[in-house]
Amino acid sequence: MDVLKISPRGYCYGVVDAMVMARQAAQNLDLPRPLYILGQIVHNQHVTDAFKEDGIISLDGPNRLEILKNVTHGTVIFTAHGVSPEVRRLAKEKGLTCIDATCPDVTRTHDLIREKAEEGYQFIYIGKQGHPEPEGAMGVAPDSVHLVETMEDLEQLTLDDRDIIITNQTTMSQWDVADIMKRAMELYPNAEVHNEICLATQVRQEAVAEQASQCDIVIVVGDPKSNNSNRLAQVSEQIAGTPAYRIGDLSELKLEWIKEAKKVGVTSGASTPTPITKEVITFIENYDPNDESTWDTAKKVPIEKILPKVRVKK
């Protein structure tokens, strides 16, 4: 079957850096044990499972602060999504060793909020409710940051039209953000705009927008919790007009989606392991609706192939 490998796709530099830092921590026997990740280092269950094999425990909970309250000793790794200053303070009070894997793009947004909130600015922050990145950003200045996910959320805000900054979560759909920002500027014409869609998110979305129309269907390989993966499927359907399905790995691919297709596009989120995506691509390339021997969708990627290799520090 004809497969269009939509590029760029897969890991971004922030994800790779975060995973390398966590793997180096696992190899560093001088670090206090246990080793914990507050949440998922990146939003991919395969990565979480692989780190468990490395001896790193990924903790889950309603938010980072509640998770941390249950940690009494050891080392904590802050995920690529960033954490609030309150989380950092509590970790320090508990005497925990901290490793910060926050993506530099997220750190830049935190710095903006911190600096401008001190000057009295209010923030309209476009992001996804319940996602850890907005949680961390809002925690920088809780009284100054107003989370907006939809146009309805925006309309319900009542802010003075002065000293306002409009910014956003780094992994949102750039088209959704643009629409909400446009309306926000109509409501608050004196506001400053700081568009923080990260470059990796932007170029992956643009690639889908430009290339998906060549395909009958698009498969996005990514975790259900991965906002950037879900947005890629959204871009395919809403911008390119091509039906799209998000799958965690090959085992979630349904053959009825592709059996009538002449060309299938495949892309993947910024936190999706390359071997997981390659397995999907190889399967679809070899798939023949008339040959049952090509229908096996069992995932076969070994867990030791999931994480990037790192050099052992001497």
UniProtKB/Swiss-Prot annotation:
Co-factor note (free text): Binds 1 [4Fe-4S] cluster per subunit.
Binding-site list for dimethylallyl diphosphate: H43, H81, H131, S226, N228, S271
Keywords on record: 4Fe-4S, Iron, Iron-sulfur, Isoprene biosynthesis, Metal-binding, Oxidoreductase
Pathway: Isoprenoid biosynthesis; dimethylallyl diphosphate biosynthesis; dimethylallyl diphosphate from (2E)-4-hydroxy-3-methylbutenyl diphosphate: step 1/1; Isoprenoid biosynthesis; isopentenyl diphosphate biosynthesis via DXP pathway; isopentenyl diphosphate from 1-deoxy-D-xylulose 5-phosphate: step 6/6
UniProt: isopentenyl diphosphate binding residues: H43, H81, H131, S226, N228, S271
Domain of life: Bacteria
UniProt key word Ribosomal protein: no
Catalysed transformations (reactions): isopentenyl diphosphate + 2 oxidized [2Fe-2S]-[ferredoxin] + H2O = (2E)-4-hydroxy-3-methylbut-2-enyl diphosphate + 2 reduced [2Fe-2S]-[ferredoxin] + 2 H(+); dimethylallyl diphosphate + 2 oxidized [2Fe-2S]-[ferredoxin] + H2O = (2E)-4-hydroxy-3-methylbut-2-enyl diphosphate + 2 reduced [2Fe-2S]-[ferredoxin] + 2 H(+)
InterPro entries reported for this sequence: LytB/IspH
GO molecular function per UniProt: 4 iron, 4 sulfur cluster binding; 4-hydroxy-3-methylbut-2-enyl diphosphate reductase activity; metal ion binding
Binding-site positions, (2E)-4-hydroxy-3-methylbut-2-enyl diphosphate: H43, H81, H131, T170, S226, N228, S271
Keyword GTP-binding among UniProt keywords: no
Top EC class, one word: oxidoreductase
Pfam family, one: LYTB
Binding site for [4Fe-4S] cluster: C12, C103, C198
Active site residues per record: E133
Family membership: Belongs to the IspH family.
Record's function text: Catalyzes the conversion of 1-hydroxy-2-methyl-2-(E)-butenyl 4-diphosphate (HMBPP) into a mixture of isopentenyl diphosphate (IPP) and dimethylallyl diphosphate (DMAPP). Acts in the terminal step of the DOXP/MEP pathway for isoprenoid precursor biosynthesis.
Cross-referenced HAMAP family: IspH
Protein known as: 4-hydroxy-3-methylbut-2-enyl diphosphate reductase
Organism in which the protein naturally occurs: Shouchella clausii (strain KSM-K16)
Phylogenetic lineage: Bacteria, Bacillati, Bacillota, Bacilli, Bacillales
